[in-house]
Amino acid sequence: MADLAKIVEDLSALTVLEAAELSKLLEEKWGVSAAAPVAVAAAGGAAPAAAAEEKTEFDVVLADGGANKINVIKEVRALTGLGLKEAKDLVEGAPKAVKEGASKDEAEKIKAQLEAAGAKVELK
């Protein structure tokens, strides 16, 4: 047990660069790859219908600023806290995300506010 405590102590003392080098050495020694978890994540996407039902985070995407861009810019500023130039760039550069990782209720509220201002909005 003392050996394990010593190993933990030694690993804790490593710098980030040393830890990265250790990781590479262990991959070579054991013949494994750190990329393996990516394959597991890709396999998890095999059931998109189930994932769509359980989706809890949404991205509010401004698809088009519409004809009344001034009102849309004002609404984007109010919702995001962006400055005038940043909000204008976001509206004119549509399609762009206004809010990422929003809850369903928050995303629908933001969508309704932007649509009331004249924008076309998508939830992703």
Swiss-Prot record:
Keywords: Ribonucleoprotein, Ribosomal protein. The keyword Ribosomal protein applies. One of its GO terms (molecular function) is structural constituent of ribosome. Pfam families: Ribosomal_L12, Ribosomal_L12_N. GO terms for cellular component: cytosolic large ribosomal subunit. InterPro entries: Ribosomal_bL12, Ribosomal_bL12_C, Ribosomal_bL12_C/ClpS-like, Ribosomal_bL12_oligo, Ribosomal_bL12_oligo_N_sf. GO terms for biological process: translation. Belongs to the bacterial ribosomal protein bL12 family. Homodimer. Part of the ribosomal stalk of the 50S ribosomal subunit. Forms a multimeric L10(L12)X complex, where L10 forms an elongated spine to which 2 to 4 L12 dimers bind in a sequential fashion. Binds GTP-bound translation factors. Forms part of the ribosomal stalk which helps the ribosome interact with GTP-bound translation factors. Is thus essential for accurate translation. NCBIfam families: L12. This is Large ribosomal subunit protein bL12. The gene is rplL.
